[in-house]
Regions:
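His/Asp/Glu-rich, glycine-adjacent segments
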Residues: 1-81, 86-93
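Alpha-helical packing segments of well-folded alpha/beta enzyme cores
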Residues: 69, 73-76, 105, 109-112, ...
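Active-site proximal loops enriched in glycine and acidic residues that flank catalytic Cys/His/Asp
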Residues: 87, 129-133, 153-155
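Active-site-proximal segments of metal-dependent phosphoesterases and phosphodiesterases across multiple
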Residues: 93-111
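Metal-dependent active-site segment of extracytoplasmic phospho-/sulfohydrolases and closely related
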Residues: 106-144, 175
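Substrate-binding rim/cap in mid-to-C-terminal beta-strand-loop elements of soluble/periplasmic
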Residues: 143-178
Length: 187
């Protein structure tokens, strides 16, 4: 979800849509906002929602525990054919943080995944977690790396799909297959 000031900045031309919002709006989808977060239809990129209270001034925003956030992600995803959760705090930690901060972020992700797995049902489909680049693992500089990034899969046919993924460019094909879309004609 995005705060109102994000939408205002885009509308005024002070900022451009970043990659995920651009893809969603280009597909005719509406971006989620504060009301979606309050209503439990979205999970904050920081997982808990504390950032909305502490940094964005949304004092009425509910705050989740990390396991609750994982369960919420699973519950929300179960209502859609395709669900995309963008978690960018690890990118910030990679650019500006210390190794200790990186470990804290990875432990948080582990706890969220534990909550998600408590309620995930294979009938929900396939869960894929990956990244578009590395940078959290390399603390000698603050740039993105070209290191291979891990991909985690669980759910329906996860082993078969894992065998089809060799790098980031293979993710789209797996998603298309799961959605029954086949291979694009121009591939």
């Amino acid at each position: 979800p995005y705060p109102e000031r994000y939408f205002s900045a885009v509308e005024s031309g002070r900022r451009l849509l970043s990659a995920v919002p651009l893809a969603a709006t280009s597909a005719g989808l509406s971006l989620m906002g504060a009301e979606d977060l309050r209503a439990g239809r979205a999970v904050s990129p920081d997982f808990t929602g504390a950032g909305w209270r502490d940094y964005l001034g949304y004092t009425d925003m509910p705050v989740l525990s990390l396991p609750e956030a994982g369960r919420a992600i699973a519950t929300i995803a179960a209502g859609y054919d395709f669900s995309f959760f963008e978690h960018w705090p690890t990118d910030q930690a990679g650019h500006r943080g210390t190794l200790t901060e990186a470990v804290v972020h990875l432990e948080a992700i582990d706890t969220v995944l534990g909550g998600l797995l408590e309620v995930w049902d294979e009938r929900h489909g396939l869960f894929i977690m990956t990244s578009d680049h590395g940078n959290l693992e390399e603390k000698s500089h603050s740039r993105h790396t070209r290191n291979p990034v891990p991909t985690l899969l669980f759910g329906r046919d996860h082993a078969r799909h894992a065998d089809a993924i060799h790098d980031l460019t293979d993710i789209a094909g797996v998603v298309r297959e799961c959605l029954g879309l086949g291979v694009p004609a121009d591939s």
